[in-house]
Amino acid sequence: MTTVYDVPADLLINRVAEELKNDSKVKSPEWVNFVKTGVHKERRPENPDWWYVRAAALLRRVYIDGPVGVNSLRTHYGGKKDRGSRPEKFRRGSGAIIRRALQQLEESGLIKREENGRVITPEGRSFLDKAAAEVKKEVEGLERY
C-alpha cells in the first residue's frame, strides 16, 4: 500500500491542493491576496492558489508529525528575516494563516483537534494515501518502490 512517505512531497502537495480546490469547505479567505506568509517575507506569494497549496502542506505535516500544534507549525513555516546590515534572525510564520487553514481542514473532517494538538483522521489518512497512490502511478520510476 502506498503512503505519503513513498512519493516526493512536492508532487503529493500539488495533487492534494488540486483536490482541496474542489472541496466546498476549504476556501481561500477574502484577505488571502493581501497578506504575506510571515514577517520574514518581503512579498506576498506569487501563486494565486497558494492557500490550497499551504492547506495541503499542512495536511501532510499533520499526517507526518501529528499530534502537532499551531506554534510548532509556525516554527516549521518560518525563516530568516533580513534586517539590513544587522545579523539575520529567525522569525516564525503567520499563525493566522495556519490557524484558519487548520480550521477549514477540521470542518472537512480531514483532521481533528485533540488535547496534545491536531491529528489526522482516518478519512484524512485515506485521502492522502489515495492521492499518493495516484502520484505513484503517474510518475515513472516510482513503481518499483
Swiss-Prot record:
Pfam families, alphabetized: Ribosomal_S19e
GO cellular component: cytosolic small ribosomal subunit
SUPFAM superfamilies reported for this sequence: Winged helix' DNA-binding domain
Keywords: Ribonucleoprotein, Ribosomal protein
MF GO annotations: RNA binding; structural constituent of ribosome
Gene3D superfamilies linked: Winged helix-like DNA-binding domain superfamily/Winged helix DNA-binding domain
Source species, domain of life: Archaea
Keyword NAD appears in the UniProt entry: no
InterPro entries attached to this UniProt entry: Ribosomal_eS19, Ribosomal_eS19_archaeal, Ribosomal_eS19_CS, WH-like_DNA-bd_sf, WH_DNA-bd_sf
GO biological process, one term: ribosomal small subunit assembly
Task performed by this protein: May be involved in maturation of the 30S ribosomal subunit.
UniProt family annotation: Belongs to the eukaryotic ribosomal protein eS19 family.
Subunit field text: Part of the 30S ribosomal subunit.
PANTHER family: 40S RIBOSOMAL PROTEIN S19 (PTHR11710:SF0)
Protein name: Small ribosomal subunit protein eS19
Organism: Methanothermobacter thermautotrophicus (strain ATCC 29096 / DSM 1053 / JCM 10044 / NBRC 100330 / Delta H)
Gene (name only): rps19e
